[in-house]
């Protein structure tokens, strides 16, 4: 029982994860005569408990407060693209905790090498159970999305055949989906993260593209536009960075606007200039205006000069 509790706390669902987390304990259990059955039973029980009693935030939010978040790769990607990391982090946290109602999806949009897959992959791998949408199989695209903590839709497209089920899943509604070689199964409200460089709000119907579902789809998403390419040595986002980012978000929550486009901003304000930087105001150059002569005075002077000429 103690072993199962430890596996649940660590989010371990396979022998590989167990070895990576604590090799010594795995070897000690594997040395017993009936070790194989014990290990399998412990992992099965832990998996059932996690799927029934745990949610994504239980594994995404770290336990320890984070003092310096500036070196976190998720923080860097968001800041590089002009987003306020604190506001964006609050969007991610609210998304994971299903706080925003039917706006249940984060869409990371942008070209290759901008970090969208880097972020989504790290978040998906941090939770014990995540499902991937297989959009190439229109008959069973959501076959892998049942009983998951996070659903990841990678580089997909929206087709007329799946759009209604997709709207329900993206909006966090319960929906039954067909499964291959099985009866239909229910997908419970699950946070969805989408990564693509195509318009996920345009529905492809054969050779035509329609936009009749654009507004309903936008009402179910937060869209981040990642356009800045990362350096070749930027590196992969780690599980610990994911946990640190969500923990920092929890400790610095701000109010989030329910809008399709996540607002940008948060640029650092320029400091006020010091006294040394303030130069003395330039002195205004004073000019002495010459006295002007009115028209009446000019005519009198002309008449006077004319009279003097005649007298001479």
UniProtKB/Swiss-Prot annotation:
What Gene Ontology cellular component terms go with this record?
A: host cell nucleus
Q: A single GO molecular function, which one?
A: ATP binding
| EC code | 3.6.4.12
The enzyme's first-digit EC class, named in words, is hydrolase
Subcellular location as annotated: Host nucleus
Catalysis: reaction(s)? ATP + H2O = ADP + phosphate + H(+)
InterPro entries in the cross-refs: Helicase_SF3_DNA-vir (IPR014015), P-loop_NTPase (IPR027417), Parvovirus_NS1_helicase (IPR001257)
Q: Where is this region: Disordered?
A: 264-301
Question: In which residues is ATP bound?
Answer: 110-117
Q: What GO biological process terms does the UniProt entry carry, in alphabetical order?
A: DNA replication; viral genome replication
Query: What keywords sit in the KW lines?
Result: ATP-binding, DNA replication, Host nucleus, Hydrolase, Nucleotide-binding
Note whether Metal-binding occurs among the keywords. Answer: no
Q: How does it associate, per the subunit comment? A: Homooligomer.
Identify this protein by name: Protein Rep40
Origin species, per record, is Adeno-associated virus 2 (isolate Srivastava/1982) (AAV-2)
What would be the name of the gene that encodes this protein? Answer: Rep40
């Amino acid at each position: 029982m103690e072993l199962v509790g430890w596996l649940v706390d660590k989010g371990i669902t396979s022998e590989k994860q167990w070895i990576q987390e604590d090799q010594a304990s795995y070897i000690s259990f594997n040395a017993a005569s009936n070790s194989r059955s014990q290990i399998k039973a412990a992992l099965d029980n832990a998996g059932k408990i996690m799927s029934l009693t745990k949610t994504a935030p239980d594994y995404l939010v770290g336990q320890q407060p984070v003092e310096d978040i500036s070196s976190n790769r998720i923080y860097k990607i968001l800041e590089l693209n002009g987003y306020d990391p604190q506001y964006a982090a609050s969007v991610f946290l609210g998304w994971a905790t299903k706080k925003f109602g039917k706006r249940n999806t984060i869409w990371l949009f942008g070209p290759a090498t901008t970090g969208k897959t880097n972020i989504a992959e790290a978040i998906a791998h941090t939770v014990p159970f995540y499902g991937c949408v297989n959009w190439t199989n229109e008959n069973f695209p959501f076959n892998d999305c049942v009983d998951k903590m996070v659903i990841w839709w990678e580089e997909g497209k929206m087709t007329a055949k799946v759009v209604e089920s997709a709207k329900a899943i993206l909006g966090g509604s319960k929906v039954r989906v067909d499964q291959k070689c099985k009866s239909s199964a229910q997908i419970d409200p699950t946070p969805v993260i989408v990564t693509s460089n195509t318009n996920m709000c345009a529905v492809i119907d054969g050779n035509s593209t329609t936009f009749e579902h654009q507004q309903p789809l936008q009402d179910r998403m937060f869209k981040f536009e990642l356009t800045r390419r990362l350096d070749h040595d930027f590196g992969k986002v780690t599980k610990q960075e994911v946990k640190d980012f969500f923990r920092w978000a929890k400790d610095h929550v701000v109010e989030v606007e329910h809008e399709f486009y996540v607002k940008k901003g948060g640029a650092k304000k320029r400091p006020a200039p010091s006294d040394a930087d303030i130069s003395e105001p330039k002195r205004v150059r004073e000019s002495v205006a010459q006295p002007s002569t009115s028209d009446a005075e000019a005519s009198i002077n002309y008449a006077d000069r004319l009279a003097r000429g005649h007298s001479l």
